[in-house]
């Protein structure tokens, strides 16, 4: 699915050409090759003392409304990945977390209009007050073997790894 039609450098139309083994968008005027790269998503795995995971229920004004997910969001252009994850968790849950180690990295193909690469971090809660905010309609703690309907297939992969004891502390 083509998302871009005009060159961001000179404004002219893109042509399709086979280059480097793929169909590419090439500017008809300046010859610039436009590479469509995935966007980086970040997610924070927050576990409580009972090893329940914090999930957010997606609000009605975002994609996949009413479904649950690990607190997540897109990385800003000039943002370090750990700081981006910490920001997203706080925006959606009210909790202030510290990024620990990377737990998982997955390519996300669930949205045909936008491929993402997701990075899931383990976290440590540093403070804050748990409340649904930003694009979250609700927040809740769930046992790893009793998870509600999820928005993203890759969250399911992460939860399976957590359930199978691949928790790194």
Which residues does each PLM region occupy?
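Unchanged
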Residues: 75-99, 104-161
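Charged phosphate-binding loop/patch that engages nucleotide di/tri-phosphates or the phosphate backbone
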Residues: 160-169
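Conserved Nudix-box catalytic region and its N-terminal flanking loop in Nudix hydrolases
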Residues: 48-91
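Conserved N-terminal beta-strand and adjoining loop/helix that marks the start
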Residues: 29-53, 74, 105
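Acidic, metal-coordinating catalytic segment for phosphate/diphosphate chemistry
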Residues: 2-43
